[in-house]
Amino acid sequence: LLMNNGVRLESQSWGADHAPELDYTGSSMVEVVKGAECIRYGFGAMGGVVLLNDAPLPYENKKIKVNGNVNIGYDTNARGFSGSGTIETGYKQFGLRLHGMYTKGGDYHTADYVLNNTGYNTISFSALAGWQGKKLTATLFSSIYYQRSGIYYASKISDLSQLIKRFEYGRPDPETVKPFSYEIKPPFQQSQHVTLKGELKWELNPNHHLNFTLSFQENLRQEFENRKKTQWSWIPVQDLMLKTYKFDVLWQAKWKLWKMTTDAGLSNTYQTNFNYPGTKQPAFVPNFAALSMGGYFLHKAEFGRLQCALGMRYDFRVLSVNGYSSLSNYTYYDDFKLYSNFTMSLAT
């Protein structure tokens, strides 16, 4: 499970070849969370959570100051190049940070031949703005991430006999290997991910805080294949739009006794998945709408060298699914499901 600047990444992650749609070059702090603390992040988090966050904004500058950095890289294998840059400024109670990233690469190669159609192209922009008062801190975060990655031509095997022949030969047929290129043709995948987040932190007193977070994500994924009709190859076989709306409330407290801390929160998520028509293929993931609500409690204490944590969480999920089973018989299905789950974790 990945958390990008406090927002749970929601994308079409059902494929083993689906890389997370986020710009790691824009994260200044990376943390791995395990144990009872994972209880706050809901389903899919019990194995651990990776937190990617920006550094704090430069508040409290008496004069306007501008800082920045640029990073440039080159990949000899794919003749790929990459660049990223950050610029930030702050003045009194206000802070602003802008970040951008671009990468482009061509065909990868082994020692003996080129792996055609394995190029990649990625571009990302993000902005973080904030205001900090005595008791309140408000931040706005937005990002857009786009990537296109080619799929190796020879990886498409039609049957077992063809696979065995490929193993026996030990390499692709030399007549099918083409010169190096940056061009990406079907089969390939492309995706676009948009994130918007608003957060308000309220300091009730030095030991008690309230956090309110509202976020929206839009994930568009398209997958293209080589089809029998060439003109259809540029029509995606999968064309999915996933939208996620989320609202979280968190109360945090510190206690003097045994260095105890308490976190209690509520989370609400509404999500829709829509398959755009015209792909001429059955949808791999059906259309659905899901409403999830949950509440959790996390308490930690220290007894000398011994650290203990107790976490409890209850989740409720409503799911409505509909679609067609195939293009041949157009069998329509419509289903409605209710799920609930209670989780408790104790760690020392």
Located regions from the model:
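Outer-membrane beta-barrel proteins, especially TonB-dependent receptors
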Residues: 1-348
